[in-house]
Amino acid sequence: PQKHTVFRVKCPKHIPEMPLTGDLTTGVYWRPEGKEYLAGSPKSVFDADDLEPAWEDFEELVWPALAQRIPAMEELKLTGGWAGYYDCNRLDNNAVVGKHPKFENVYLATGFTGRGLMQAPGIGRALTELITTGSYQSIDISNMAVERVLGKKARPEPYVL
């Protein structure tokens, strides 16, 4: 599993209609959560033994990026944070979906790093087609196959929010 830290911050000037936003130059992301904001960065570590938030990332990465993009965030206050695990593979941070090449009747849909809920309808449909017809019919997701991981053919996902 990959450990990610999420920070909760309060800003004097609340902007309630701001959508989930990501700064692709730094990887820092943020979104409103009630009267506060949640923010984080793509910096992560593969450490299954430590769930303590990476507080230093707030000062070094998150706050500077927020203040640069949204000047009002210069005055924000850190109100909390937590760390949790993302399900992913070490090769490229992308999901693994499809029939297992070595085991009959085993199908995989794993490693979505928090994107599973958004991708579930399409993945469900694709797997249903694969199981019932032997191939993908409406959307070809063969590039997510387990052979990609076994053959170490990475399709890197640089921004895991």
Task: Give each language-model segment a name.
Residues A67-L161:
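C-terminal catalytic lobe of FAD-dependent flavoproteins
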Residues P1-T5:
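Predominantly flavin-linked oxidoreductase catalytic cores and closely associated redox partners
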Residues K10-L108:
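Active-site lid/adjacent beta-loop-alpha segment flanking the redox-cofactor pocket in flavoenzymes
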